[in-house]
Amino acid sequence: MKRTFLALGFLLLAALSPASAAELRIGMIGLDTSHVPAFTDILNNPANKNHVPGAKVVAAFKGGSADIESSASRVDGFTKTLVEKYGVKIYDSIEEMVKHVDAVMIESVDGRPHLAQAIPVIKARKPLFIDKPLAGSLRDVLEIFRLAKVAGVPVWSSSSLRYGKAAQAVRAGSLGKVTYAETTSPASIEKSHPDLFWYGVHGCETLFTVMGTGCESVKRGTTADGKIEVIGKWKGGRTGIFREAKGYTGLAKGEKGEAPIGAYDGYAPLVVEAIKAFQTGVVPVSSEETIELFAFMEAADESKRRGGAEVTLAEVLKKAGK
């Protein structure tokens, strides 16, 4: 798959003129999150201290979810900002928008429409980044990656917390093999999504950044102050724990010692990786790892439904159609 994505990246660049190859045209879908103006300013504004060159947001599809207040109350304002401040052209359909861009970012705060929004992008063979949450259900997560694999289109997803400097250092081997990690983040719940998909995904993403794949089961409980606590068992006796809290913190332990993790280092590192993936066709996070991350969070919900019983990831993946 990696070779396929790399070849696709080369074909993408070859199809562009020298001028456009230096500046990819980005289309955004779903203008109802603060990530929209933040990412656009990083890409379109050379005066931004975190400016990422090589791409520009030029087109967008408004989107929005009437039944989610944080979407309905902000989509018009963010759309106005993109048009008036950055000169972004708004299209009435995703199918029309993709004709005018080289790559796409799905930013809709609501994960439920992500599959439907991804389908025309994948059909048009445009490299795609999907902001958190990748989807509104584990079943949709699996289907997005299935469609991407069949089409040979690079598709990936990540929280910006994955690219905190401390977490990346541990992932790169600063502690050797990680045997234990715990992370925290806010975990506000949106009733239309599994509990951790909405915001707890941030801390869970950090956990998987340092632990990697291999989680076999989870048990969900509560902390002493009544917050969410999820304990995951990894192959080889390794343990990873997510806890709901106000801040982004964590600790990783490995063969060479331990180190704090979890700090938020801004959006720019994530945007850098997104543009790099668009340019090369090589995704920085495998579908296998992202699927396991969402299975971890789905299993946490199933554990809650069963009163804190241990639930395997294999079980929830099978139920979701894998």
Across the structure, where does each feature detected by a protein language model lie?
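Bacterial N-terminal signal peptides
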Residues: A7-A15
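Short helix/strand-capping hinge loops at secondary-structure junctions
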Residues: R125-P127, K132-P133
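C-terminal helix-rich "cap/oligomerization" subdomain common to oxidoreductases
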Residues: M105, Q279-K322
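Glycine-centered short loops/turns at secondary-structure junctions
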Residues: R125, G152, G307-G308
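A contiguous active-site-proximal alpha/beta segment in oxidoreductase catalytic domains
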Residues: L134-H193
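N-terminal glycine-/serine-/threonine-rich beta1-alpha1-beta2 phosphate-ribose binding loop
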Residues: F5, A21-A124, V150, L313, ...
